[in-house]
C-alpha cells in the first residue's frame, strides 16, 4: 500500500507541475515596442477654481448622496431617520412567516388496524401492504383496503 501511495503522490506532482507550466507557455511574447507619437502636445486647463473651493464637495446636511426625500408625505415615514420607509406591516409579515416556517411538522400516526382486518385483506388481495393498508388493483393506482373488520 505504501508503494501505491508514493506512486500516486508522484503522479499528482508531475500532473500539477505540468499543468502550471502550460499556461505560461501558451501566452504570446510581445516583442514590439509601442510607437511614440511626437506630434501630441500636452494642454493644461488654466481655469481658476471657484472662490471658496477647497478640493472637496461642500457639506449639505439632510442629503444622502443627493437624495432629497419624497415629494409628498408617506405613511410610516418619519423625518430625520435613515431615509428609508419601513411600514409596520412588513415587520409583522416577516414575523408571521418566520413563525410559520419555524413550526415543526405535524406527526401523523397511522391508525392501528386489527389483526382480523389485516388477515382479511391479505386473504382477499395478493398485493396488499399492511404498512399503508393499500392494495394494487389490475387497473389504476393503489387503493385502500376496507374490510368488515375495519373501524
Swiss-Prot record:
Keywords: Cell membrane, Lectin, Membrane, Signal, Transmembrane, Transmembrane helix, Virulence
Membrane association type: Single-pass membrane protein
Localization: Cell membrane
Superkingdom, natural source: Bacteria
GO terms for cellular component: plasma membrane
Position of the signal peptide: 1-26
Pfam families tied to this protein: BA14K
Coiled coil: none
InterPro entries in UniProt: BA14K (IPR012413)
Annotated GO MF terms: carbohydrate binding
Known function: Has immunoglobulin-binding and hemagglutination properties, and can bind to mannose. Essential for virulence. May be involved in LPS biosynthesis or polysaccharide transport.
Protein name in UniProt: Lectin-like protein BA14k
Amino acid at each position: 500500500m505504501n508503494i501505491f501511495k508514493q506512486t500516486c503522490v508522484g503522479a499528482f506532482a508531475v500532473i500539477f507541475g505540468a499543468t502550471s507550466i502550460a499556461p505560461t507557455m501558451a501566452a504570446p511574447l510581445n516583442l514590439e515596442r509601442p510607437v511614440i507619437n511626437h506630434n501630441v502636445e500636452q494642454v493644461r486647463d488654466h481655469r481658476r477654481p471657484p472662490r471658496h473651493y477647497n478640493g472637496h464637495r461642500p457639506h449639505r446636511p439632510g442629503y444622502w448622496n443627493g437624495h432629497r426625500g419624497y415629494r409628498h408625505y408617506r405613511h410610516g415615514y418619519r423625518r430625520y431617520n435613515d431615509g428609508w420607509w419601513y411600514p409596520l406591516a412588513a415587520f409583522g409579515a416577516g414575523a408571521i412567516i418566520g413563525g410559520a416556517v419555524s413550526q415543526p411538522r405535524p406527526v401523523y400516526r397511522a391508525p392501528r388496524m386489527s389483526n382480523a382486518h389485516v388477515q382479511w385483506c391479505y386473504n382477499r388481495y395478493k398485493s396488499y401492504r399492511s404498512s399503508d393498508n393499500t392494495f394494487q388493483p389490475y387497473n389504476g393506482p393503489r387503493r385502500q383496503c376496507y374490510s368488515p373488520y375495519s373501524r
